[in-house]
Amino acid sequence: MVYYPELFVWVSQEPFPNKDMEGRLPKGRLPVPKEVNRKKNDETNAASLTPLGSSELRSPRISYLHFF
């Protein structure tokens, strides 16, 4: 198991979910906490606003997703 403190990510070689967790998680997509949904909606709304006098269309950018 490796811990990256700057990313706050745990990396493990174990499969997920393990046998102890079977039956606890729904099949398919994992549930997303309401705080994340609210933050995503707020960021999308804020990012879609254009400055006054600007006709430029901007695509919303989600800054809290990290790809590695």
Swiss-Prot record:
Region (Disordered) location: 22-54
InterPro entries: Neuronal_3.1
Compositionally biased tracts (Polar residues): 44-54
One GO CC annotation: cytoplasm
Gene name for this UniProt entry: NREP
Main location: cytoplasm
Name this protein carries in UniProt: Neuronal regeneration-related protein
Conditions for induction: Down-regulated in emphysematous lung compared to normal lung.
Record GO biological process: axon regeneration; regulation of neuron differentiation; regulation of transforming growth factor beta receptor signaling pathway
Phosphoserine PTM positions: S59
Record's keyword annotation contains Phosphoprotein: yes
Domain of life: Eukaryota
Its biological purpose: May have roles in neural function. Ectopic expression augments motility of gliomas. Also promotes axonal regeneration. May also have functions in cellular differentiation. Induces differentiation of fibroblast into myofibroblast and myofibroblast ameboid migration. Increases retinoic-acid regulation of lipid-droplet biogenesis. Down-regulates the expression of TGFB1 and TGFB2 but not of TGFB3. May play a role in the regulation of alveolar generation.
Tissues in which the protein is found: Expressed in lung (at protein level).
Compartments where found: Cytoplasm
